[in-house]
């Protein structure tokens, strides 16, 4: 028996799925168009994000078509639409699995890129097509496996695996395993970034202290004898901007003449350097916190996205399909459809896509955005370089956000 089988419930769930699919379509197109129209969004990592965006778009369209049919009065689970429902369920399983593979692939390749040059990384960079092919192969295997053993049916707004038990063990639990794996990977990514920053800061601090310890070089000048008339400052020199230097020079002289030795202001230089370092350390701590938030946002977004649907599914499995209201079921369906919309935020607004669109629409804001790029670029600023590596801290120091 299909869940919420009455006509009103089916149309209500279809409307929820339709609204969510439209938002996901917009989010997916936002990422795809950003890749083709924004030069800063064409790095190697953005090529991987493009693959994820394409899968998000196809999944959103696969939600959009059946939900629109149901809203307009067509019954996708009727006997004459059995083929349509089976195709819709097969594609649903295909793209859900494909997005899972894309998520963990992007996380693993990001970690690999931050770990330094390697033959594997070199091969991946030269064979992006293989990275694109891998999620399709894995998801096709999963979809055909499900198609061979289980039936697809209307689950409320779209077709998917008909059995809740199968959906729970074949889709929900593996997705949570992937979320946990991604969490561990991005924690490792954050530790690599933090370690590289510390190494760069240590080298910079060492160079700064070495320059502070260097003995000041005296500058010896001989001031000629002067008379009181020479201490008068010419007004023309003041108006031309040379008055202050003339004033200092004339006052430094003496009526008897002497050898003047001027040392570098070591104490003032050290105070200035300490203030600059304190400000720089505070800014770096702020940037590190932003990177930490960004690292946790990747897996956390999907954990939030799948938390309620998983809880609802567990309750329904435990109670034989009952136990939640139509509104809770609608919320769970909405979150399932939100993949493209969430990815647009996590991989778009969270990185440099939003700033790129702003620069394209408002070129006058480009200078301000370039100043803010150090805190808004996120991990993209690191992995978009040709060969970021821990073995060259200077590169990290220049390129880290």
UniProtKB/Swiss-Prot annotation:
Gene Ontology biological process terms in this record? adenylate cyclase-activating G protein-coupled receptor signaling pathway; cell surface receptor signaling pathway
Provide Extracellular-side residue ranges.
1-16, 69-93, 150-175, 316-321
Q: Does the keyword Cell wall biogenesis/degradation apply?
A: no
Q: Where are the transmembrane segments?
A: 17-37, 48-68, 94-114, 129-149, 176-196, 295-315, 322-342
Compositional bias (Polar residues) at which positions? 391-401
Family, per the entry? Belongs to the G-protein coupled receptor 1 family.
Protein name per the record: Ascaroside receptor GPR3
Q: Which organism is it from?
A: Arthrobotrys oligospora (strain ATCC 24927 / CBS 115.81 / DSM 1491)
């Amino acid at each position: 028996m299909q869940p919420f089988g009455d006509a009103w419930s089916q149309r209500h769930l279809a409307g929820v799925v339709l609204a969510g699919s439209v938002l996901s379509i917009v989010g997916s197109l936002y990422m795809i168009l950003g890749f083709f129209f924004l030069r800063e969004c064409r790095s190697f990592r953005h090529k991987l994000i493009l693959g994820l965006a394409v899968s998000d778009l196809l999944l959103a369209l696969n939600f959009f078509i059946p939900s629109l049919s149901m809203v307009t009065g067509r019954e996708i689970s009727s006997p004459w639409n059995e083929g349509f429902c089976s195709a819709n369920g097969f594609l649903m399983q295909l793209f859900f699995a494909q997005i899972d593979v894309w998520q963990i692939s992007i996380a693993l390749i990001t970690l690999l890129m931050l770990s330094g040059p390697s033959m594997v990384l070199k091969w991946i960079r030269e064979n992006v097509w293989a990275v694109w092919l891998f999620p399709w192969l894995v998801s096709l295997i999963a979809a055909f496996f499900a198609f061979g053993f289980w039936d697809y049916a209307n689950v409320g707004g779209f077709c998917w695996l008909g059995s809740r038990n199968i959906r729970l063990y074949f889709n929900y639990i593996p997705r949570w395993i992937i979320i946990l794996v991604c969490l561990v990977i991005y924690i490792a990514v954050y530790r690599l970034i933090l370690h590289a920053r510390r190494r760069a800061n240590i080298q910079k601090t060492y160079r700064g202290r070495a320059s502070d310890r260097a003995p000041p070089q005296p500058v010896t000048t001989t001031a000629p004898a002067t008379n009181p008339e020479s201490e008068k400052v010419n007004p023309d020199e003041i108006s031309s901007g040379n008055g202050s230097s003339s004033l200092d020079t004339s006052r430094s002289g003496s009526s008897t003449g002497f050898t003047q030795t001027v040392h570098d202001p070591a104490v003032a230089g050290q105070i200035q350097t300490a203030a600059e370092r304190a400000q720089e350390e505070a800014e770096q701590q702020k940037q590190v916190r932003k990177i930490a938030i960004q690292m946790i946002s990747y897996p956390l977004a999907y954990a939030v996205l799948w938390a309620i649907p998983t809880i609802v599914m567990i309750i329904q499995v435990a109670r034989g399909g009952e136990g939640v209201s139509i509104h809770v079921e609608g919320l769970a369906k909405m979150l399932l459809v939100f993949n493209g919309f969430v990815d647009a935020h996590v991989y778009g607004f969270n990185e440099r896509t939003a700033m790129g669109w702003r620069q394209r629409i408002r070129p006058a804001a480009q200078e301000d955005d370039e100043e803010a790029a150090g805190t808004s670029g996120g991990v993209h600023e690191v992995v978009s370089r040709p060969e970021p590596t821990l073995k060259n801290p200077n590169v990290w120091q220049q390129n880290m956000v």
